C-alpha cells in the first residue's frame, strides 16, 4: 500500500476506504433485493447454475434489466456471484452463483445434507423493516446501555422477542432463518463431536430448545440417548410438535432446569449479561450429576482483532445482538466463557472449534 500518515494507506486510499464504508449499506440491501426477486433460485435451477444475463432473470419485456445488472455487479464484487463477459462486443454480462452465493439456495451449500435449508431467510430476517429501523438508533445503546435496546426504541417499546410473538409472518421467517443457520452447524457438530461427546448420556436436556429440532437431530444420530427433554418457555413448547422420545417441558431457566446426564444449549448465553449467564450455568450445575456436562454452542470472538472474514462475521453479529435483542447481551472470548463456568461451580472447561462461527463449549461438573 502507498505511504500515508498511518504508514499503511495514502490519503487518497484512506478516503476511498471511507467511501466504501459510508456506502456499505448497499451490500446487504442489494443482497436482500435479489433474494426477494428470486435470483439465486433462478440461477441455481436445481444445480445447473448456468450463467444468465439480468434480462434472463426478469420477466420477458422488462423495461430496463440494467437495474438488476447493477445489483448483480455489486454483489459480484463481494463474492456472491461470478461475472462472465464474452470476448465479443457488445456482449451481455452473465452471472452465476459462487460458493458464497450457493448458500442462498436449498442444497447449494447452506446445508450439507441438502435438506432444503438455506441462508436466504437469514438474510431476509435480518433486514425486515422492524429490524432495519433499529440501526439509526444504535448510538442510543452507547448513551444509555441499561435502557431499551435500539430495536425496542424504534418499535414503540416492543422488544424483538415480543415482536416475533405478535407478528406471525415475521416469526415464520425468523424460524426458517434459525433453521437455515442451525442445520449446517448441527451436522458439523454431530460429525465432529457426535457419539464421543455424548458418550454415557441417556437423558439429554436442551435448554432453550424451541421446537426441539436440534434435540431431534442429536437423538436421531446418537442412539444411546433414550430420553430427550426440550426445555423452553411454556408458550414456546406449547407450540412444539410431537417428537418421538422427546418430552416438551415449560419453565424458566433462571429458576430451575430439568435434570439430565447432560445439558445442551445453542446460542442461549449470547443475549444475557455475565451475571445472568452465571445464574443460568449455576442452575445447569444443580441439574447435573457428578461428571455431567453442559454442551453450549456459542459464537466465540477472538482475543485480537483482525480483518479476517471470521472475525468480521463474529463482531458484526455481536453488534446485531446489541441493536436487536439486548444492548448488554454480548458475544465473548474463550477466556470469558471459561470464567463464567468456573463462577457457576464447574470443575473444568474446554472449547472445541468445529465450525468457523460456532464453538462447542464443554463445562464439566
Swiss-Prot record:
Which GO BP terms sit in this record?
biosynthetic process; methylation; nicotinate metabolic process
Protein EC: 2.1.1.7
In terms of InterPro entries, this protein maps to: COMT-like, O_MeTrfase_dom, Plant_O-MeTrfase_dimerisation, SAM-dependent_MTases_sf, WH-like_DNA-bd_sf, WH_DNA-bd_sf
Do you know which Pfam families this protein is assigned to? Answer: Dimerisation (PF08100), Methyltransf_2 (PF00891)
Q: Which PROSITE patterns match?
A: SAM_OMT_II (PS51683)
**SUPFAM superfamilies in UniProt:** S-adenosyl-L-methionine-dependent methyltransferases, Winged helix' DNA-binding domain
Q: If you read the UniProt record, what top EC class would you report for this enzyme, in one word?
A: transferase
**Amino acids binding S-adenosyl-L-methionine:** 232
Task: Please tell me whether the keyword Transferase is annotated for this protein.
Answer: yes
Catalysis performed (reactions): nicotinate + S-adenosyl-L-methionine = N-methylnicotinate + S-adenosyl-L-homocysteine
User: Would I find Transferase among this entry's keywords?
Assistant: yes
* Any GO MF annotation of the entry: O-methyltransferase activity
Tell me which UniProt keywords the record has, alphabetically: Methyltransferase, S-adenosyl-L-methionine, Transferase
PANTHER family, A to Z: O-METHYLTRANSFERASE
What's the family? Belongs to the class I-like SAM-binding methyltransferase superfamily. Cation-independent O-methyltransferase family.
Function description? Involved in nicotinate detoxification in planta. Catalyzes the conversion of nicotinate to N-methylnicotinate, which is a detoxified form of endogenous nicotinate in planta.
Q: Indicate what this protein is called per its UniProt record.
A: Nicotinate N-methyltransferase 1
Q: Which organism is it from?
A: Oryza sativa subsp. japonica
Q: What are the top taxonomic ranks of the organism?
A: Eukaryota, Viridiplantae, Streptophyta, Embryophyta, Tracheophyta
Its gene is: NANMT1
Amino acid at each position: 500500500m502507498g505511504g500515508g500518515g498511518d504508514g499503511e494507506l495514502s490519503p487518497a486510499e484512506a478516503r476511498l476506504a471511507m467511501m466504501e464504508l459510508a456506502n456499505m449499506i448497499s451490500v446487504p440491501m442489494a443482497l436482500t433485493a435479489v433474494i426477494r426477486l428470486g435470483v439465486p433460485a433462478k440461477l441455481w435451477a436445481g444445480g445447473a447454475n448456468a450463467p444468465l444475463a439480468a434480462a434472463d432473470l426478469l420477466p420477458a419485456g422488462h423495461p430496463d434489466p440494467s437495474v438488476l445488472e447493477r445489483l448483480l455487479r455489486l454483489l459480484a464484487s463481494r463474492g456472491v456471484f461470478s461475472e462472465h463477459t464474452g470476448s465479443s462486443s457488445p456482449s451481455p454480462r452473465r452471472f452465476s452463483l459462487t460458493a458464497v452465493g450457493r448458500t442462498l439456495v436449498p442444497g447449494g451449500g447452506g446445508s450439507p445434507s441438502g435438506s432444503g435449508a438455506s441462508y436466504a431467510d437469514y438474510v431476509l430476517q435480518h433486514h425486515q423493516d422492524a429490524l432495519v429501523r433499529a440501526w439509526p438508533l444504535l448510538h442510543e445503546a452507547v448513551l444509555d446501555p441499561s435502557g431499551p435496546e435500539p430495536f425496542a426504541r424504534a418499535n414503540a417499546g416492543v422488544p424483538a422477542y415480543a415482536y416475533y410473538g405478535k407478528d406471525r409472518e415475521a416469526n415464520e421467517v425468523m424460524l426458517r432463518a434459525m433453521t437455515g443457520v442451525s442445520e449446517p452447524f448441527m451436522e458439523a457438530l454431530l460429525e465432529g463431536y457426535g457419539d464421543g461427546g455424548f458418550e454415557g448420556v441417556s437423558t439429554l436436556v436442551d435448554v432453550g430448545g424451541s421446537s426441539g429440532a436440534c434435540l431431534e437431530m442429536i437423538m436421531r444420530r446418537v442412539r444411546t440417548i433414550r430420553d430427550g427433554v426440550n426445555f423452553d418457555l411454556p408458550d414456546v413448547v406449547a407450540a412444539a410438535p410431537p417428537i418421538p422420545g422427546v418430552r416438551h417441558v415449560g419453565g424458566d431457566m433462571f429458576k430451575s432446569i430439568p435434570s439430565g446426564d447432560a445439558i445442551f444449549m445453542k446460542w442461549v448465553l449470547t443475549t444475557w449479561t455475565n451475571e445472568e449467564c452465571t445464574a443460568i450455568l449455576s442452575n445447569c450445575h444443580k441439574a447435573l450429576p457428578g461428571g455431567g456436562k453442559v454442551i453450549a454452542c456459542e459464537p466465540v470472538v477472538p482475543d485480537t482483532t483482525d480483518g479476517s472474514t471470521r472475525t468480521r462475521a463474529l463482531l458484526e453479529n455481536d453488534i446485531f445482538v446489541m441493536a436487536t435483542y439486548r444492548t448488554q447481551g454480548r458475544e465473548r472470548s474463550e477466556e470469558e466463557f471459561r470464567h463464567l463456568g468456573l463462577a457457576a461451580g464447574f470443575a473444568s472447561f474446554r472449547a472445541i472449534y468445529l465450525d468457523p462461527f460456532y464453538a462447542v463449549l464443554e463445562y464439566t461438573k
